[in-house]
């Protein structure tokens, strides 16, 4: 792969398509803790990460799997679960003494109304100061699960409200 004296091999994580170092550099320059949102098909994970010279240090991790403890028994990969995970993360983040952060979505697409921004809305609603634009948040009917109820007939809204009250209460 590295042939010729003028060729420079990119960093391994850049070659694998896992890290955008230009964005990472800008996030670290802010000197704020990063609120890292990662989504899969079945789960949402949010982490509080601080950059140090030895390497990044993870202070807090919240997964949407934890919502089962708060009475949310539906899918943990949808928009209501992302919001509740963000809300739970925000409460735990404030309990640790961190009241601000900066959003790190990694290589996820920057789509208005996505699960990433539903999680961010949960973090912001918990009282954490994260720079954002309100236009990127999904509308309240999607966050509460009314769209899922209309589509599948499963009542997500009541469990969403109960879990939200349990997290905030």
UniProtKB/Swiss-Prot annotation:
Signal peptide: none
Entry keywords, A to Z: Ribonucleoprotein, Ribosomal protein, RNA-binding, rRNA-binding
SUPFAM superfamilies from the UniProt entry: Translational machinery components (SSF53137)
UniProt keyword annotation of Membrane present: no
Listed GO CC annotations: cytosolic large ribosomal subunit
Pfam family of the protein (one): Ribosomal_L5e
Domain of life: Archaea
InterPro entries: Rbsml_uL18_euk (IPR005485)
Biological process terms in GO annotation: ribosomal large subunit assembly; translation
Keyword Translocase set for record: no
GO molecular function: 5S rRNA binding; structural constituent of ribosome
Family note: Belongs to the universal ribosomal protein uL18 family.
Subunit structure, interactors included: Part of the 50S ribosomal subunit. Contacts the 5S and 23S rRNAs.
HAMAP family: Ribosomal_uL18_A
Role: This is one of the proteins that bind and probably mediate the attachment of the 5S RNA into the large ribosomal subunit, where it forms part of the central protuberance.
The name this protein goes by in its record: Large ribosomal subunit protein uL18
